[in-house]
Amino acid sequence: MQNIHFIGIGGIGISALARFLKEKGFKISGSDLKESKITKELEKEGVKVSIPHHKDNILNKDLVIYSAAIKEENPEFKYAKELGIKCLSRKEALPLILEDKRVFAVAGAHGKSTTSSILASLLDDASVIIGAILKEFGSNMIYKESQNLIFEADESDSSFLNSNPYLAIVTNAEAEHLDHYGNEVSKLHHAYAEFLDTAKIRVINAEDEFLKNYKNESIKLYPSKDIKNCTMCIENFKPFTSFELKDLGEFKIFGMGYHLALDASLAILAALNFLDIETIGARLKNYQGIKKRFDILHADENLVLIDDYGHHPTEIKATLSAAQEYAKLGGYKKITAIFEPHRYTRLAVNLKEFAKAFEGVDELVILPVYAAGEEPIEIDLKAVFPKALFVENIQREGKFLVASKGQVFEEGLIIGFGAGDISNKLRQKNE
């Protein structure tokens, strides 16, 4: 049995790979800087997790796989190199993990986790590796004795080019992570085209500025004309979205927002290659959403508290539109957004767009930037958001939120945005 060690095993994407290889019969261990909910869960599942990194953790290992966050000076990485242990980045390890599978890969700047998770509900015989927790299964990985595997493919480091897709879905090709592509949009778009070209079956959002010009044969979704009568409702505080897709009939899915109808439509069009429409409609009802995507943590007549992973203006704008609809349907008079900016570079490049994205809220609370390992950039956020409340911290107390300055947030619709630490701040310790 091969011993595989993961450096940075607490990451949402890398932990899914570790879980998958464990189910395949490999002996898995890992390490991370600090303990987290994911590392605790992995230990319960029988994975030896060491906190923090130490060079001895890689002794007697046959292979080391490391996350994108790991630098060359990491003690485990350095020692593994000295000992001649094979070291693969997550990107380099993908062919090893996916080589014997028929891969249904989902890529795009926004919506790939949601589209992947909906596809997982529809193609319920497939294994799943995604960068989010599926509420239906309580994990970011599902292992099935099947040739089929649904994979959330990442464009940020071009690792999606190593996913060998049989079926490829691209939700959109908006410019994100341009630093990896030499700040050239054309290089990013070339990578998306290469990803699609590799697949036998391609499903695309044909109204995306880049994808609308994709020349090879593909199944095309034109959202503005193919998605009709999109409506939302709340049942016992749970959100649902109904819509008609092409001439395929009406569909209803857990969650809220036009963007959800778009993601679901792409998943449905992909699944139609393997299932009849009646089966798809029935299985869509099993979908329970994913953690951190319009994730309702508490709801009563006076207060609804929502956690969302949105960290780019496009995502925030779409989710706030859904939040406004939820507030209207639920009779909540006030919308408060709590924003933890993620990465200085993203914030600096999109400052004006972030300001526009939050225009519809009644109150905006801004937390310190979550650097994600970046060097700080001087940004005058108070000039960009003159009406915002800036606080050092916020924490959950019962069903309410309390800021470091003493303000209590206890009514209306409160929604937190960010890909850093905000999710932990919004949740009770056991959530």
Swiss-Prot record:
Q: Name one GO cellular component term.
A: cytoplasm
- Catalytic function, reaction form: UDP-N-acetyl-alpha-D-muramate + L-alanine + ATP = UDP-N-acetyl-alpha-D-muramoyl-L-alanine + ADP + phosphate + H(+)
| EC number assigned by the record | 6.3.2.8
Disulphide-bonded residues: none
Class of the enzyme per the UniProt entry, highest EC level: ligase
Quote the pathway field. Answer: Cell wall biogenesis; peptidoglycan biosynthesis
Location within or outside the cell: Cytoplasm
What processes does the entry annotate via GO biological process terms? cell division; cell wall organization; peptidoglycan biosynthetic process; regulation of cell shape
GO molecular function annotations of the record: ATP binding; UDP-N-acetylmuramate-L-alanine ligase activity
Q: Which InterPro entries match?
A: Mur-like_cat_sf, Mur_ligase_C, Mur_ligase_C_dom_sf, Mur_ligase_cen, Mur_ligase_N, MurCDEF_pg_biosynth, UDP-N-AcMur_Ala_ligase_MurC
Major location (coarse)? cytoplasm
Keyword list (alphabetical) reads:
ATP-binding, Cell cycle, Cell division, Cell shape, Cell wall biogenesis/degradation, Cytoplasm, Ligase, Nucleotide-binding, Peptidoglycan synthesis
Q: Where does ATP bind?
A: 108-114
> What Pfam families does this protein map onto?
Mur_ligase (PF01225), Mur_ligase_C (PF02875), Mur_ligase_M (PF08245)
Q: Which family does it belong to?
A: Belongs to the MurCDEF family.
Q: State what this protein does.
A: Cell wall formation.
Q: What is this protein called?
A: UDP-N-acetylmuramate--L-alanine ligase
User: What organism is the protein native to?
Assistant: Campylobacter jejuni subsp. doylei (strain ATCC BAA-1458 / RM4099 / 269.97)
Record gene name: murC
